[in-house]
A protein has these predicted regions:
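Electropositive phosphate-/nucleotide-binding environments in soluble metabolic enzymes
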Residues: 2, 17-20, 49-52, 87-95, ...
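Active-site loop/helix belt of alpha/beta enzymes
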Residues: 23-36, 41-162, 166-170, 234
Length: 285
């Protein structure tokens, strides 16, 4: 909004310009300090940005404004994590990027996490700035083709809880709503204080990986609002208060990649990181 420009000016915040209305706002803005902007090219993702044929005229408009001090060039890949129609997913957008910005001055930024990892040797892709998002948290942008170990990524975000109860099942006993899991033999289970109201994906089925005291095991039955159940067979010493790692770094050097949990739930690690409920206590270490 136009009023945001004053805040950007006072705090020296760089901001993205992606349409002509924003250039109009800048032209009308009485700024305290000149603005530093990223001019967005729509190179093929078709969300934000100027079309390639309009990019240079947008740059010229910005460059003529006394309110603008520095113009950097930016775009965003849609398919950097995979191939697109049988060729590298970035090919069509790099062609548009070159055509629209080849002789324009300014620092450049087009690489997201996937491009930063998969095209690390390409200086044109790396540009002057990379926008590393998911990889900063240890998530893998091209999972399941590659995992965190392949890229040398470490989790920076973990979700953990504890066992609040244990139950001993007999063969034929069921667990949770809808009796979605039925034991085919005697089985000891644990109840974890975490559920979909905390942001854990409700659609995670029986078999979703989880760590108990750093040992990998599985969820069983449906995820409830505030609780979920886990198989304690691999962790016979687990009991009330035992640590449970839903994703991330667990005790004794154990790690449960968030992408393993996301894949089981039919989603991606990005969504899990964004979906934690406000009621979940956050500790920054």
């Amino acid at each position: 909004e136009p009023r945001d420009l004053e805040l950007c000016s006072r705090l020296n915040l760089w901001h993205v310009v992606h349409n002509n209305e924003q250039i109009d706002w800048l032209a009308a803005h009485k700024t305290h300090q000149p603005h530093r902007v990223f001019l967005k090219l729509n190179s093929g993702m078709n969300r934000l940005g100027f079309a390639p044929q309009a990019y240079r005229s947008a740059w010229a408009r910005l460059n003529a404004l006394p309110q603008v001090d520095e113009i950097s060039l930016v775009s965003h890949f849609s398919d950097a994590d995979a191939d697109r129609f049988g060729v590298s997913g970035i090919t069509h957008q790099m062609l548009a990027w070159h055509a629209a910005s080849a002789d324009l001055p300014g620092e450049r930024s087009i690489a997201n996490s996937a491009a930063t990892l998969r095209h690390a040797a390409d200086t044109e892709v790396r540009g002057d700035w990379v926008r590393a998002g998911i990889m900063i948290y240890g998530g893998v942008p091209d999972h399941p083709e590659h995992d965190a170990a392949h890229w040398g990524l470490q989790p920076a975000m973990s979700l953990s809880s504890r066992l609040i109860a244990t139950q001993q099942l007999a063969a034929g006993d069921s667990v949770g709503y809808g009796s979605a899991f039925v034991a085919d033999a005697p089985l000891r289970i644990g109840i974890v204080a975490c559920g979909y109201a905390d942001g854990y994906p409700r659609h995670c089925p029986t078999g979703t990986p989880v760590l108990v005291n750093g040992v990998r095991t599985r969820t069983i039955g449906r995820v409830s609002m505030d609780m979920l159940a886990v198989d304690l067979s691999p962790v016979p010493d687990a009991g009330l208060g035992s640590e449970v790692t839903l994703w991330g770094r667990g005790p004794h050097g154990s790690v449960l990649p968030i992408d393993d949990v996301a894949r089981a739930g039919g989603t991606i690690g990005y969504e899990l990181m964004c979906a934690l409920a406000r009621r979940v206590p956050v500790r920054v270490a």
